[in-house]
Amino acid sequence: MFRQLRLTMDISGWIFMPWRRSLSNKQSPPPPLASTINDVIVDYDDPDYLPLPEYPVRPNEPLDIRKQRLLYQSRKRGMLENDLLLSTFAAKYLDNFNAEQTAQYDQLINGVSNDWDIYYWATDVKPTPKEYDTEIMRLLKDHVKNAERISRIRQPDLYSSES
């Protein structure tokens, strides 16, 4: 019995040792690194300073594969506002797009480097640049106005439950 008690105490001491050590070391935090003291503010308005990678064009991609990719990309934007707007837009319109409309939608959601730009253009907060002011953008703006007053608090299901 004493051997088991001693073993239990040894194990508990081993488990709680880092916790005890952290309580006993009440030292001040280390000084900041020298490289962080003289940080430089980067001006991102200069396009030559920070080149953004261009989205690869996929000319030989089959239309059905492109639509599947765009449906996924419409749902997984990384910001909830665009996830909701673009996923509901894609669920409503993407299946009926022809090849040219699909290419315009691809350029819209993948050609822009900042998702907030898409959001501001679609909600008419900022004017849409000429190269993105297409039939698809006008359709997206109408979709965002939500004249039908459809609830869009969640993304639509990928597949309807009827099938």
Swiss-Prot record:
Superkingdom: Eukaryota
Keyword Transport: no
Subcellular location: Mitochondrion matrix
Transit peptide location: 1-23
Cellular component annotations (GO), alphabetically ordered: mitochondrial matrix; mitochondrion
Record has rRNA-binding as a keyword: no
The entry's keywords: Chaperone, Mitochondrion, Transit peptide
Main location, first listed in the record: mitochondrion
Pfam family, one: Sdh5
GO biological process per UniProt: copper ion homeostasis; mitochondrial electron transport, succinate to ubiquinone; mitochondrial respiratory chain complex II assembly; protein-FAD linkage; tricarboxylic acid cycle
Functional note: Plays an essential role in the assembly of succinate dehydrogenase (SDH), an enzyme complex (also referred to as respiratory complex II) that is a component of both the tricarboxylic acid (TCA) cycle and the mitochondrial electron transport chain, and which couples the oxidation of succinate to fumarate with the reduction of ubiquinone (coenzyme Q) to ubiquinol. Required for flavinylation (covalent attachment of FAD) of the flavoprotein subunit of the SDH catalytic dimer.
Entry-linked PANTHER family: PROTEIN EMI5 HOMOLOG, MITOCHONDRIAL, SUCCINATE DEHYDROGENASE ASSEMBLY FACTOR 2, MITOCHONDRIAL
Family indicated by similarity: Belongs to the SDHAF2 family.
Subunit structure: Interacts with the flavoprotein subunit within the SDH catalytic dimer.
Name of protein: Succinate dehydrogenase assembly factor 2-B, mitochondrial
Organism: Drosophila ananassae
Top-level taxonomy: Eukaryota, Metazoa, Ecdysozoa, Arthropoda, Hexapoda
